[in-house]
Amino acid sequence: METYEQEYRLLRADIEEKLNDLSKSGENSVIQSCQRLLNEIDEVIGQMEIEITGIPTSERGLVNGRIRSYRSTLEEWRRHLKEEIGKSDRKALFGNRDETSGDYIASDQDYDQRTRLLQGTNRLEQSSQRLLESQRIANETEGIGASILRDLHGQRNQLEHSLEMLGDTSGHLDRSLRTLKTMARRLAMNRFFTTAIIAILVILILLVLYSKFR
């Protein structure tokens, strides 16, 4: 985020300088430079809006406020540029003066051509605005998608960890069952031997008694 903000500050210095030059000259080259810089600034702000999804919630409010301020300033620059373009177009439209009276003059053909040019410029600007808005929405959607993917990745890791723990528990359970089976076999053997010894003792006692009373 810091990298994008540094880039924004550099672009801000450039656009403010260009807008100042435009107010003085009104040249088409300066207008094109301003439009290019505004598009770059819009892209940088769009990247900030994507990056904010990865910022901790405790810091997100402050950063989001700065981003809103950047976008508001961008809209002000766009309005300023639009006003300067209008001034430049009006100057181009009524730029010829009568040398004797000093009044602006323009032929009907020039007027029609320049009117169509202004209309075409306005349509182009509207299309550019719609394109930029679509790009901003796409950037926001991409940010939401990236956040969802991160959440899914985290859930996958948790699931894998749970499966590992379940596997360990299953292994411990198998070992416990084997131990219980071994103990049960030993208990059965001990019971068999104990029963056999008791039976032998009973037989011996009976033999002794039999020999005495014979």
Curated annotation (Swiss-Prot):
CDD domains xrefs: SNARE_Vti1
Molecular-function annotations in GO: SNAP receptor activity; SNARE binding
Any one GO CC term of the record: cytoplasm
Primary location: membrane
Transmembrane segments: 192-212
UniProt keywords, alphabetically: Coiled coil, Membrane, Protein transport, Transmembrane, Transmembrane helix, Transport
Membrane topology: Single-pass type IV membrane protein
Ranges per topology, Cytoplasmic: 1-191
Subcellular location: Membrane
InterPro entries, alphabetized: SNARE (IPR010989), T_SNARE_dom (IPR000727), v-SNARE_N_sf (IPR038407), Vesicle_trsprt_v-SNARE_N (IPR007705)
Vesicular membrane side: 213-214
Annotated GO biological process: Golgi to vacuole transport; intra-Golgi vesicle-mediated transport; intracellular protein transport; late endosome to vacuole transport; macroautophagy; retrograde transport, endosome to Golgi; vesicle docking; vesicle fusion with Golgi apparatus
Top-level taxon in the UniProt lineage: Eukaryota
Function: V-SNARE that mediates vesicle transport pathways through interactions with t-SNAREs on the target membrane. These interactions are proposed to mediate aspects of the specificity of vesicle trafficking and to promote fusion of the lipid bilayers.
Family, similarity comment: Belongs to the VTI1 family.
Protein name according to UniProt: Vesicle transport v-SNARE protein vti1
